[in-house]
Amino acid sequence: MSLIRTILKLVVVVGFLSLTVQFIRHWMANKQYVFTKEEVAKLAKQYAGQDHEQAFSKVVVELRRRYPGHILPDEDLQWVFVNAGGWMGSMCLLHASLTEYVLLFGTAVDTGGHSGRYWAEISDTIISGTFRQWKEGTTKSETYYPGDTIVHSAGEATSVQWSSGTWMVEYGRGFIPSTLGFALADTMFSTQDFLTLFYTARVYVKGMILEASTFLTESGVL
């Protein structure tokens, strides 16, 4: 009887998880999104090759003009270290929701490692430096330069390498909470830099609050 109960519980759990995944997939396939990867890439490409700090300032100004209420204010912008997959970089989150994010990303030192495998599509447009990618199932790598956009498809895994001084604009679309395990695992279990963990969680929550506030305002609730 104990074995039967265990099997029944397992069936219920698997069934519940399957329904949850199907619901999320249906929701993501039919919801309206704020950004498109083409729009973000086109905007970033205008400033490729420029000094990255000046380029980022222009990108932020233009994003705020095009998407009012969806980009964090200056007082909430913060460069935060990211340790994941063996590499180390820094990000500045501009927008965050359950299904989208926009951020500035890069590194001041040579670094590389595993890309991670996500339930999300991620695209990066290079402003400065070089990015090298070795895709799963291939025997050769490709190198990308300022103005290039690299698309990391959902479920894909690659080896990644950035040269020092590589900076880019990144847009992600998918079930964003599913990416946090990879993004935070090294911080939690390797570097144990819990201050960085706090900074990361805080800015993501701020992005979620801003998005919720904008949604309620546009819906006429606030």
UniProtKB/Swiss-Prot annotation:
Subcellular location: Nucleus inner membrane; Nucleus outer membrane; Nucleus envelope; Cytoplasmic vesicle
All ranges on the Cytoplasmic side of the membrane: 30-222
Any single GO CC term annotated in Swiss-Prot or TrEMBL for this entry: endoplasmic reticulum membrane
Annotated site, Important for ligand binding, chain positions: D124, E170
UniProt topology in membrane: Single-pass membrane protein
Transmembrane segments: 7-29
Domain of life: Eukaryota
Region of interest: C-terminal hydrophobic region: 175-222
GO biological process: lipid transport; regulation of cellular respiration; regulation of response to endoplasmic reticulum stress; response to wounding; retinal rod cell development; swimming behavior
Main location group: nucleus
Residues in compartment: Lumenal: 1-6
Listed PANTHER family: SIGMA 1-TYPE OPIOID RECEPTOR-RELATED, SIGMA NON-OPIOID INTRACELLULAR RECEPTOR 1
Function field: May function in lipid transport from the endoplasmic reticulum and be involved in a wide array of cellular functions probably through regulation of the biogenesis of lipid microdomains at the plasma membrane. May regulate calcium efflux at the endoplasmic reticulum.
Subunit composition and interactions: Homotrimer.
Family indicated by similarity: Belongs to the ERG2 family.
Record protein name field: Sigma non-opioid intracellular receptor 1
Organism field: Danio rerio
Top-level taxonomy: Eukaryota, Metazoa, Chordata, Craniata, Vertebrata
